[in-house]
Each structure stands twice: as structure tokens, then as C-alpha cells.
Amino acid sequence: MVSQETIKHVKDLIAENEIFVASKTYCPYCHAALNTLFEKLKVPRSKVLVLQLNDMKEGADIQAALYEINGQRTVPNIYINGKHIGGNDDLQELRETGELEELLEPILAN
């Protein structure tokens, strides 16, 4: 079971960053999501907090905290302006409908 302190820490990270992505270095869906953000949509890396959970001592706890917060067990686990987007499939669906660009507009305007 994940501690309330870890849950609060993860919630703070989500709130403090315009875009938050929990990822794993070996995950092809994570690579696709990050490629969409950085390469296709040209989101500056300074606007995105990417946590590579498999490279972090507390990675499993962070992933467990995200599950407690939003019910998603898998990575990538993406937030934009504090709103839970979901995973790569959700990100790509939002891109296809044009909603992703709308969500990113205030971030890219700064």
C-alpha cells in the first residue's frame, strides 16, 4: 500500500507542472507519447516533467500512487494542466480530434 505522503507528493508534481508524464524507458507507448509531444507538436521539454519510473528508486511507489489517484495502472500516465489525459491511445485520440492542440494552446503560448 502506498503512503499518503507519496500520494500527496505525486499530486503536487502534477499540480506544479504544465505537463506531467509518468513513463518507462523501455515502453513503446511511452516513446510514442513523448514523440508526439516533443517531435510532432514541438512542446518544449521545459514544459514537461517526465518521470522514468524504472530509473527511480521510488518509481513503483509513484506508479502505485498514480493508480490510487486516477485508477490507471499503466504507463504512460499523462496529465496536462492538472487534467488526467490517460495513456498514449488517449493522447493520440485527442490529437486526432483536435482537442490536444486546444489543451496545449495556453502552454505553448507562454
From Swiss-Prot:
Record carries keyword Hydrolase: no
Query: Residues that bind glutathione, according to the entry?
Result: K24, T25, Y26, C27, P28, Y29, Q63, V75, N88, D89
The processes (GO biological process) annotated in the record are: cellular response to oxidative stress
Q: Which reaction does it catalyse?
A: 2 glutathione + H2O2 = glutathione disulfide + 2 H2O; 1-chloro-2,4-dinitrobenzene + glutathione = 2,4-dinitrophenyl-S-glutathione + chloride + H(+); RX + glutathione = an S-substituted glutathione + a halide anion + H(+)
The secretion signal range is none
Q: Which Gene3D superfamilies match?
A: Glutaredoxin
Residues that the record marks as modified (S-glutathionyl cysteine) are: C27
Miscellaneous comment: Present with 3030 molecules/cell in log phase SD medium.
Q: Cross-referenced PANTHER family, in alphabetical order? A: GLUTAREDOXIN 2, GLUTAREDOXIN-1-RELATED
What family does this chain come from, according to its entry?
A: Belongs to the glutaredoxin family.
Instruction: State the protein's name.
Output: Glutaredoxin-1
The organism is Saccharomyces cerevisiae (strain ATCC 204508 / S288c) (Baker's yeast)
User: What lineage does UniProt assign to this protein's organism?
Assistant: Eukaryota, Fungi, Dikarya, Ascomycota, Saccharomycotina
Q: Which gene encodes it?
A: GRX1
